[in-house]
Amino acid sequence: MSKSASRARLFEIIRRRSFGRGEVTLASGRKSDFYFNLKPTMLDPEGATLLAELTYEALKDDNLDFIGGLEMGAVPLAGALAQISWIKGHPIAAFFVRKKPKEHGAKLAIEGLPRGETLQGKRVVIVEDVTTTGGSAMKAVESVRETGAEVVLVLTMVDREEGATDTFGAAGLPFRSLYKASEFLKA
């Protein structure tokens, strides 16, 4: 399937499984009359594959060591991308950032790294399923930067176009999206 055909097919899957209209309160606290819940798309076999392939294509030239983001939205995507990247011969390892460190066990804030391995000096992309203001992704950025990693960009599946570009710009971070909310609102 061509890249444009994959993008069109994924758009339809997101529209059917993950986009809705109706009043909701977003993670940012804002009210909205439409919403995206990408988990049904990210956990669907075809949706997960298309998301991972399109994300890999968007990132393959960025010379990345790791992909990760804040739980829960980044976990399915990071895992699927790690798998696709290995299949394509350019492995990008995955991790996720806990909203708060576990209070038991190893008490980790960042999960998925082998024992003794760190993100220090590594090139990292932060991914997110849906981005509104960028606040949630910035929490992940801050946690990852504290490890000494270089966060090279933030990539979201859907940009709600409500301030994230400004948030990441102020932090000196490039920001990319696979889709814009306006594409779904016009469909």
UniProtKB/Swiss-Prot annotation:
Reaction equations catalysed: orotidine 5'-phosphate + diphosphate = orotate + 5-phospho-alpha-D-ribose 1-diphosphate
Q: Which domain of life, per UniProt? A: Bacteria
| EC number of the protein | 2.4.2.10
Main EC class the enzyme belongs to: transferase
Report the InterPro entries cross-referenced here: OPRT (IPR023031), Or_phspho_trans_dom (IPR004467), PRibTrfase_dom (IPR000836), PRTase-like (IPR029057)
Residues bound to orotate are 132, 160
CDD domains, from UniProt?
PRTases_typeI
Q: Name one GO biological process term.
A: pyrimidine nucleobase biosynthetic process
Q: Which residues bind 5-phospho-alpha-D-ribose 1-diphosphate?
A: 98-99, 102, 104, 128-136
Q: Which cofactor does it need?
A: Mg(2+)
Q: What does this gene product do?
A: Catalyzes the transfer of a ribosyl phosphate group from 5-phosphoribose 1-diphosphate to orotate, leading to the formation of orotidine monophosphate (OMP).
Family recorded in the similarity comment: Belongs to the purine/pyrimidine phosphoribosyltransferase family. PyrE subfamily.
Cited HAMAP family: PyrE
Q: What NCBIfam families has UniProt attached to this entry? A: pyrE
Q: What is this protein called?
A: Orotate phosphoribosyltransferase
